[in-house]
Amino acid sequence: MTIYTITYNEELMLPYFIEHYRKRFPNCKIVVYDNESTDDTRAIAMGMDCELITYSTNNKLSDSTYLEIKNNCWKGQNDWVIVADCDEFLDIWESDLENEQASIISVEAYNMVNIEDNLDIYGITHGVRSTSYDKAYCFNASKIHKINYGAGCHSCSPTGQVSYSKKKYEARHYKYINIDYMIARHAIFASRRSEENIQRGFGAHYAYPPEQIKQEFLTARKNAIKLL
């Protein structure tokens, strides 16, 4: 199993991401594509024995570069791979894949919501259903020729021996961690949107005003159900 992720200033989430997948796949290789983080992301990746690959977009958030990486980073592998953002935790184990005949894992995803006003990731137990995150995170690279992710990897048009698992595995997207943290992250990403992203409408939600972000968070908290 090889796991690929893309990071920019993910010092909060990256340790949890690595621990989550190493627990499920003890011998996995984790490859971190880092977009020149300015916090401790790079040190964390190297300190936790990940392969670190740095790429530059001139300090701009570039969805086209993001897609180029995710559509190609796994090529050349002959086993299962996971391609996920640092806040996307697929709940699947090594034993689940040992006898899986399908080439792509089916997913039922939830946006995780912190009911408390803290940054305790392990304490987040609630979520709201999010069909847009039913992504093709996990697939068998020996059977898939191209994954052909679309914008944000929310859709894909794979080629090769394409078959989806009958069982759906839960994916947890840690979106609503903390109101202040979410507002601050949105502001950072809004300031980094490339001209291409702006013209194509990619990442438009990052430009939402703080009050709108807060209300979105509180609505999610109100509707969240216990998952863990």
Protein language model features and the residues they cover:
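A conserved acidic beta->alpha catalytic loop
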Residues: 33-44, 57-59, 85
